[in-house]
Amino acid sequence: INDILHAQNFPKIYTFDIETEISDEFPDPEKAEQKVVSISLVGPDMSCIVYGLKQMNTEQKELFKTRYLDWIENNPFAKKLRGNKTPKVLYEYFESEEKMLERFFTVIVPKIAILAGWNAYRFDWQYLVNRIFKLFGKGMAYNMIRKASPIGETKQISWKEQDGTSVRVPGPCHSEIIDYMEIVKQYDYILRPYESYSLDWVASHAVDANKIKYEGTLQQLQR
């Protein structure tokens, strides 16, 4: 018991990323007009689950799994996180965007101590929050964010834009949402000066990891 009490137990960090349907306009997180078509979650051991609106057959799921595991195998940083176990790779289909978002906020987020993303404040989390406001209305949306909290309470996630404008978005208490881009901008001095704050540039220079290359269009990718 003494060892347990004095052990350094760090909360597990899960990373998330969303994709929206393709349109002629770039998705605006403040308006959240386009449908959210997928939400990806990656655990600390590189296990991955994707929630999506596209039905995939067994062959497509296996191809998705193979490509992901191959990417890990070819990246030393990802292999180190993976350890000796093979990561789980799952895809869960949802009939509607509403059902997918409701599950994410009310079932998934409450189980996660720290949910992290790249540019998560300005895009992913802000988009998800404004999207549920649009789909469910203010009252039900706030109720979903409360359910995302293990104590049933909300807080304000805030940041400043380059012009000094303060932005606030509701988030769950005790389910921490963090933005790696904000952390890098404020606290990292090793890679400066930055040529770009894109995830691909920072990851390639920090841990020698690149995004999976795709030669087709986004429309083709979502088919």
Annotate each PLM feature.
Residues 1-111:
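DnaQ-like (DEDDh/DEDDy) 3′-5′ exonuclease domain used for proofreading
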